[in-house]
A protein has these predicted regions:
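A conserved beta-strand element that flanks and buttresses the S-adenosyl-L-methionine
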Residues: 106
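Class I (Rossmann-like) S-adenosyl-L-methionine-dependent methyltransferase catalytic domain
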Residues: 1-40, 45-97, 118-121, 135-221
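A short glycine-rich, Lys/Arg-flanked "PGG" loop and its adjoining helix->strand segment in the class I
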Residues: 120-132
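Short catalytic micro-motifs in class I SAM-dependent methyltransferases
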Residues: 109-110
Length: 221
C-alpha cells in the first residue's frame, strides 16, 4: 500500500471527512458480533475521520484504529485524547502494530483501495490478530458490477484501477473491484458466514450508473 498521497492530500483539504457512522457497519456489527462479551476488543482498519468511533465507544468496547493518514490520525488523537495510545498512523497492509488479539476487526471501504497482493497480505495479518472465532467485517468492498469498473486507468492488477478523472473515485488513487470468486480466494483461510452484494440503481432522479459493493462477514476458524 504505502499509503497513497491522494488520501493524505484529501484529508489535508478536509475532503473525505465523514461525521456520521456508516449504518451498514453498525447493523452488521450488531447482527453478527457477540458484543455482550466483556473486554471486547475492536480494531478498525482505515478509521479515517473517525465516524464510527462514537458508535463503538457507546458499546463500551476497547477500540483501536489505524489509518495511513498521519494528518487525520493526529486530528483524532486531539478529538479523543483517551484513545491517543490506541490510534496509529501506518500501513495496515504490512503491519498491524498492536499487542494482543481482537474479537472483531472491521473495515469500511479501506482495504478495497489496494492491490490484490496487499489485500492478501493484510488478510493474513488480520487472521493472526483475530482471536479464535473472532470475526472480520468488511463493508463496501467495490464490486466488478460497479459502473466505474469500466473506467479509470488499467494497472498491472486486473482488479485494480486508478487515475479516475470524474466521479466518486476522482483523485483517490487505487480502487480495487472484486467478484465472488476473487473474494472466495481472498478469504480461503476464513469461514465466510455472510457474503452480500449490494447493487443500487437510482430511479429518481433516474441514472444509468449503478453502485455495487460487497459486504463480508468472515470468522477465524
Amino acid at each position: 500500500m504505502t499509503f497513497s498521497k491522494e488520501w493524505n492530500l484529501a484529508y489535508k483539504k478536509n475532503l473525505q471527512i465523514n461525521n456520521w457512522p456508516f449504518s451498514e457497519l453498525i447493523s452488521y456489527t450488531i447482527r453478527f458480533s457477540k458484543l455482550k462479551k466483556t473486554k471486547f476488543r475492536v480494531l478498525e482498519l482505515g478509521c479515517g475521520s473517525g465516524p464510527n468511533i462514537p458508535f463503538f465507544l457507546s458499546l463500551n468496547v476497547e477500540y483501536f484504529g489505524i489509518d495511513g493518514g498521519t494528518i487525520i490520525i493526529n486530528k483524532l488523537k486531539k478529538q479523543y485524547p483517551k484513545l491517543k495510545h490506541n490510534l496509529f498512523a501506518g500501513d495496515f497492509t504490512h503491519e498491524i502494530p498492536y499487542t494482543g488479539k481482537f474479537d472483531l476487526i472491521v473495515d469500511r471501504s479501506a482495504l478495497t483501495h489496494n492491490f490484490t497482493n496487499d489485500i492478501k497480505n493484510c488478510l493474513q495479518l488480520i487472521y493472526k490478530k483475530l482471536k479464535t472465532n473472532g470475526k472480520f467485517i468488511g463493508i463496501d468492498w467495490f464490486s466488478t458490477n460497479h459502473f466505474e469498473y469500466k473506467n479509470g486507468s488499467k494497472t498491472t492488477d486486473p482488479f485494480t484501477k486508478n487515475n479516475f478523472k470524474t466521479g466518486q473515485f476522482k483523485k483517490l488513487g487505487n480502487v480495487h473491484f472484486s467478484n465472488k470468486r476473487h473474494l472466495l480466494d481472498f478469504f480461503e483461510n476464513f469461514k465466510i458466514e455472510i457474503l452480500d452484494e449490494k447493487i443500487i440503481y437510482s430511479k429518481i432522479p433516474s441514472q444509468k450508473k449503478n453502485f455495487a459493493s460487497w459486504h463480508i462477514v468472515a470468522r477465524k476458524k
